[in-house]
A protein has these predicted regions:
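A short acidic, Gly/Pro-enriched loop at the edge of an enzyme's catalytic core
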Residues: 113-121
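Class I (Rossmann-like) S-adenosyl-L-methionine-dependent methyltransferase catalytic domain
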Residues: 1-53, 57-59, 65-114, 130-144, ...
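Short glycine-rich loop/turn motifs that provide flexible caps or phosphate-binding loops at active sites
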Residues: 61, 123, 149
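A short SAM/SAH-binding and catalytic strip from SAM-dependent methyltransferases
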Residues: 120-133
Length: 201
């Protein structure tokens, strides 16, 4: 899929909390993360793309129902997974029940970023919901919490039916332009784009 950087812009305002609450009120798993083959494949590619065998502390904002959180628990000593919707948190906690190294919390981003630092950050299908200002705050705040030499994995949906729309292509271009990040791995197909960056310094 051929794209030109800058051919779409972020939403003027970040998608509201009410928007996401409404999605969960209409359907337990709004994006069918637990059952859709494309998401299962995306998660498998994401896990295979992590450069290191094991990480000390992982931050996963926008964890939804916790499918990727379960997989990250196998590779990380500690996982902090967060979502803004109470119902998503309930489901993610159920999915990770029995995994003592996973903590699921409710957080509204970018206002409620976590304390401490991480050697892995995993962001999936989140950044294109943010306004330009909130995206900048989210990236700056998240990267401030990523340790030097730590990895950031981002994976986002590609809108193959409407290739001019603001999607994963655009938010990953913003990530790639962020100072202090070194590209490590890139995967792109008709369904999603995935990048792994390493923090320099």
């Amino acid at each position: 899929m051929t794209r030109t950087q800058g051919d779409a812009v972020p939403p003027e305002e970040s998608f509201s909390l009410d928007h996401f609450i409404g999605l969960y009120e209409a359907k337990d798993d709004p994006w069918d993360n637990a059952t859709k083959w494309n998401d299962q494949r995306k998660y498998a590619v994401a896990m295979a793309s992590l450069p290191r065998v094991r990480y000390r502390r992982c931050y996963e904002p926008g964890c939804a129902v916790g499918m990727l959180s379960v997989m990250l628990a196998e590779r990380c000593d500690e996982v902090l997974a967060v979502d803004c919707v109470d119902e998503a948190v309930v489901q993610a906690r159920a999915a990770t029940a029995g995994l003592a190294n996973v903590r699921v919390e409710r957080a509204l981003l970018p206002a409620e970023l976590p304390d401490g630092t991480f050697d892995l950050v995993v962001i999936g299908d989140l950044l294109y919901y943010l306004s330009d200002d909130d995206l900048r705050l989210m990236l700056d705040g998240t990267l401030a919490r990523l340790e030097a030499g730590g990895d950031l994995l981002a994976v986002h949906f590609r809108d193959r039916q409407n290739p001019g729309n603001y999607d994963g292509f655009n938010v990953h271009a913003r990530l790639a332009a962020h100072p202090g990040l070194q590209p490590v791995i890139r995967h792109e197909d008709e369904w999603f784009v995935l990048d792994v960056f390493r923090k320099i310094g």
